[in-house]
Amino acid sequence: MPSTPEEKKKVLTRVRRIRGQIDALERSLEGDAECRAILQQIAAVRGAANGLMAEVLESHIRETFDRNDCYSREVSQSVDDTIELVRAYLK
């Protein structure tokens, strides 16, 4: 879980954006929108959820392995590399 107020604010902003996308998707489904438009909205929700997951996971990894400079520069670089890989996978 994000530990700083700034990180928490970013995560909550993402959650609210996803909520807005879900609400728009629901309205589209209720309004019998075209399948193409609905699929596009679903893809946007999925992308936003993956972004949220990456943000929270990055925060967790950094809190667990990269706090207070107690590890070597090599470990810090490994943490950065791992986060980069996770973000690429979730795109």
UniProtKB/Swiss-Prot annotation:
Keywords: Cytoplasm, DNA-binding, Repressor, Transcription, Transcription regulation
Keyword Transcription regulation included in the entry's annotation: yes
Region forming the signal peptide: none
Description of what induces expression: Negatively autoregulated. Induced by formaldehyde. Also induced by acetaldehyde, methylglyoxal and glyoxal, albeit to lesser extents. Markedly induced (41-fold) by polyhexamethylene biguanide (PHMB), a broad-spectrum antibacterial agent, but overexpression of the gene causes no change in PHMB sensitivity. Not induced by S-nitrosoglutathione or bulky aldehydes, such as furaldehyde and tribromoacetaldehyde.
Quaternary structure, from the entry: Homotetramer. Dimer of dimers.
Function field: Formaldehyde sensor. In the absence of formaldehyde, mediates repression of the frmRAB operon. Acts by binding directly to the frmRAB promoter region. In the presence of formaldehyde, it dissociates from the frmRAB promoter region and allows expression of the formaldehyde detoxification system encoded by frmA and frmB. It senses the toxic chemical formaldehyde directly, with no metal-dependence.
Protein family: Belongs to the FrmR/RcnR family.
Protein name: Transcriptional repressor FrmR
Organism: Escherichia coli (strain K12)
Gene designation per UniProt: frmR
